[in-house]
Structure formats: C-alpha cells, structure tokens
UniProtKB/Swiss-Prot annotation:
SUPFAM superfamilies: Globin-like (SSF46458)
Entry-annotated residues carrying N4-methylasparagine: N72
Gene name as annotated: cpcB1
Species, as recorded: Pseudanabaena tenuis (strain PCC 7409)
Name this polypeptide is given: C-phycocyanin-1 beta subunit
Residues engaged in binding (2R,3E)-phycocyanobilin 1: C82
NCBIfam families found in the cross-reference section: phycocy_beta
Subcellular location(s) of the protein: Cellular thylakoid membrane
Length: 172
C-alpha cells in the first residue's frame, strides 16, 4: 500500500502538480479494500478454531468411515493430524486473503500436498470436502456486516471462496 501512495506522490511531484481528485479517490478505494481485507482476516483468524472444529465435525458426520476403526482419522493421533492439516490450510488461506495473492498459498501449502496425501493413503476427496466446509463457515463469518468496514464485499467474498476452491482442487 505504501508503494501505491509513494508512486502517486512521485508522479505528481515529477509533473509539478497536486495529486488529482481521481488519484485520491483511487487511493481511498484501495484503503477501503485493505480495511475490508483486514476485517475478513481478523474475523477468520479469531474464529479459526471453531471453523476447523465445526468443519471436521460436519465432515465426520457425513463420512463416518473416516473415524471408524481403520479410517484415516481413526485414533487420536490421526485425528490430530487431520485437524492440524485443516488449520494449516486455513492459515495459508488467510495469508492469501491478506495479500490478495494466492501464490503464498500455492507455494508454501498446496505445492505437493496431493502427492503427500496419496503417499499417506489419505483420501483427497475427503480433505476437499473438509476444505469446502471451512470455506462456507469462513465466508459466513467474514461476510457478517456487523462491526466491519461498510461497503460491497461481494468481490472480496468471491476472492476468499476462490482460495478455498484452489485448496480443495489441489488435494482432490
């Protein structure tokens, strides 16, 4: 954000002109968008434990074989690993939301994840369902209009959904 402000000031200075109304409006829009991002990240982060726990609970209710003897989430150690992985995906999604860029999610979280799950015998389709459940919860929490920056958040919610979709597709 600082770079955008510095660029506008530098351009105006090189022309020997004041910053135009259009440039001020563009910077105001950028600040408002940044505030909405921060609100969304803060809400998702503040509710991350509930998002992960509720998504896992819903996943295991739909796919009880996962927690039955012989299932991929059977035993407390495997369950803990499943919850940890869901939390890691959610954390990297928040990084992508904050930056407005999926590359950190792709490079540091999703790159090679499908292959890891295949090697471990973890059903990627089940992981994708869990990610989808986190997506629904995170968007509902982030899109709550109470106590956040006002304005149309539909584009941001769509963007947030795309990060979860990217994660689900990477493991399916």
């Amino acid at each position: 954000m600082y770079d955008a402000f510095a660029k506008v000031v530098s351009q105006a200075d090189s022309r020997g002109a004041y910053i135009s109304a259009a440039q001020i409006d563009a910077l105001n829009a950028m600040v408002a968008d940044g505030s909405k991002r921060l609100d969304a990240v803060n809400r998702i982060t503040s509710n991350s434990s509930a998002i992960v726990a509720n998504a896992a609970r819903a996943l295991f209710a739909e796919q009880p074989a996962l927690i039955a003897p012989g299932g991929n989430a059977y035993t407390s150690r495997r369950m803990a690993a499943c919850l940890r992985d869901m939390e890691i995906v959610l954390r990297y999604v928040t990084y992508a939301i904050y930056s407005g860029d999926a590359s950190i999610l792709e490079d540091r979280c999703l790159n090679g994840l499908r292959e890891t799950y295949l090697a471990l015998g973890t059903p990627g389709s089940s992981v994708a369902v869990g990610i989808g459940k986190m997506k629904d919860a995170a968007i509902a929490i982030a899109n709550d209009p109470n106590g956040v920056t006002r304005g149309d958040c539909s584009a941001l919610m769509s963007e947030i959904g795309s990060y979860f979709d990217k994660a689900a597709a990477a493991v399916a």
